[in-house]
Amino acid sequence: PYAYEALSPNISGDTLHFHHDKHFQTYVDNLNTALADCPECQSKPLDELLKNLDRLPDPKRTAIRNNGGGVYNHLLYFDGMCACHSSRPSGGLAMAMERDFGSFEGWKEQMKAAALGQFGSGYAWLVSETSGKLSVMKLPNQDCPLSMGLWPVLCLDVWEHAYYLDYQNRRAEYVDRWFERVNWPFAQERYEGCRQ
């Protein structure tokens, strides 16, 4: 949704290029391969597949979980950032953060703790229940909150390929810089979508 250099200096054009055109594209290609001989899966939207992994044919379940999660999670990650420097959420999302985390800063602390506490690869998530209650969680690999009945509002990719070219092993610095690029209008739209 933006040029490779648009998130610089927070995330470099090189990182974004490799992340999007190499890593993300591999998930897209592998998901398409997994779906190629599964006609009953092809007619369903990706979010429905991830919500209903237990209903997928056994031979396809793991490939769709891993690669479908890789596609969905990356799309949310990329769309959840913007070229403009972000400030804070507004509207219903801001009120929900105040209610559920005590403050915007309380949310940031929990999100950062989840991102830094994720051992190895995975994501930190801001998720909502259908009631609108927000929480923060971390999940390994390409697991997706949809599979747990939760609605993803934002995600922060903490796989090393998301930051290593720019920050090497300084994940905390990457997390701090990610906060500066959060696409709050997108997050607000996602939050409103949890009740539909």
Residue map of PLM features:
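Feature for soluble, non-membrane regions of globular proteins
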Residues: 1-196
